[in-house]
Amino acid sequence: MPTLHDHAHIGGQQLRPESLMMSYGYTPAWSEGAIKPPIFQTSTFVFDSAEQGKAYFELAYGLRQQGPDEEMGLIYSRLNNPSLEILEHRLTLWDGAEDAASFASGMAAISTTLLALLKPGDVVLHSEPVYGGSDFFLKNVLPKFGITAVGFRPTATPEELTAQVAGIEQGRLAMIFVETPANPTNHLVDLEACAALARQHGTSEHPIRLVVDNTFLGPVFQHPLKHGADVVLYSATKFLGGHSDLIAGAALASKPLMKEIKAMRTFMGTMCDPNTGWMLMRSLETLKLRMERAAQSAQIIADWLRAHPLVQRTYYLTHLEHCPAQQDIYRRHCLSPGSMISFDIKGGEPEAFRFLNALRLIKLAVSLGGTESLAEHPATMTHSDISVPEQAEMGITAQMIRLSIGVEDPRDLMLDLEQAFEAVGMVKARELELA
């Protein structure tokens, strides 16, 4: 029977992830020659014998060590499912991870991972801003479990981070949680500096884990494991799913860490369902094509926005001339600026709302990474649970608009953006006349 290694190599040469998304981890002979794996829509699996069932449960609950030639069998879809196992094998290829787990949502991946790796008395040092749901979980849910969250700005220097760690008076630093690029400001965090900090202050007995939400650029344009991360997280709803038709999440790490995360997933029941897993496998086949096309269009649109008279500022990863430190991180960590753009429209919330309400081709909706372009207002939508003073500290402004660029023709997107700007300009002109 061919192994995963056999699937991934030809003539001793490693195949690239985009070439393996159609076949890795699956053999058509398993399913009547079907070129695509079927959806294993089942809750439970039949054992060949009571002895086999006992052996599977011993491994599932860690009652004994797995034998050298022993495989974990199928028990129940809350533990494992063939649709999810094939998906998870394929997910590992993009980041070069040993193992992966799929989840019911991005927040399921984040919450399960953090609860698996943290305990009462621990401290999480986290970048700010992060996605609003992550921010709420860090600051409002984890404290209920005796876990403290301490934020830091992505522009903090290694010296400032070291001072912040030294200032932790109660609890033990157990994790550095990073979202980079940050949502919605596109600020970058130096993963290598965070990894060095974790090594400096952690021990073999009490390691400090570096956990990275890689949703904005991954898994094609940034690979955190190569820069010292221990765990990589995704909202698979976004670029991995890519069609705005599913909700899912993913975590990738070493086998020992994934064993802990998967155990927590089993008992929390946060796994992805087989149908969603199958849809994600479909999406992975076009992942690189979609992300590259969207990034090409985003670069054109970001440059156009920067020159627009009604735009005060753009937040895009090739517009970092004002901050050499951010440019340096971009050069070391990122393979592309991606397709997420934020910009400040001149004015405030009223102008931002007029602009958003005037869009026609670009849809007014939260989420990102789909084939269609989306626009939203972070201050009152995705990050509305963060107080206004905290938003200001994080760089989230009332006039900020976040764009997720899809695969439409960029000329048509700019046509839509321009008519929305004109709608704002016409209202402002009328207001001046009335004044």
Each language-model region and where it sits:
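Conserved N-terminal alpha-helix of the aminotransferase class I/II PLP-enzyme fold
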Residues: 39, 44, 49-108, 133-140
